[in-house]
Amino acid sequence: MASPGVYLFTRKGRRAYVGRSDRDVVARTRSSYRQGDYDLTITVYETASARQAYLLECRLFHRHRPCDNDIHPAVPAGTNWRCPVKGCPWS
């Protein structure tokens, strides 16, 4: 069954990219993974809601500062959610 969630790709053992799906994290992981760019090990966190996925993605983005994430995670369309990390301009 599809669920929202967050995923982490690594390169040479270091966090390189954090992403999320508000509907189906496994499908999103499959479509986003580029063999040769990332290690074969992928970390996936399923969440109970799109909101939880967004909040977790923000926390992981700030904690790991992945080199392949150029910008802060986007707020899902139609929501006014804020980043949970204190001091972030998106909070």
Description of each model-found segment:
Residues 1-15, 21-91:
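Boundary/linker segments flanking structured domains
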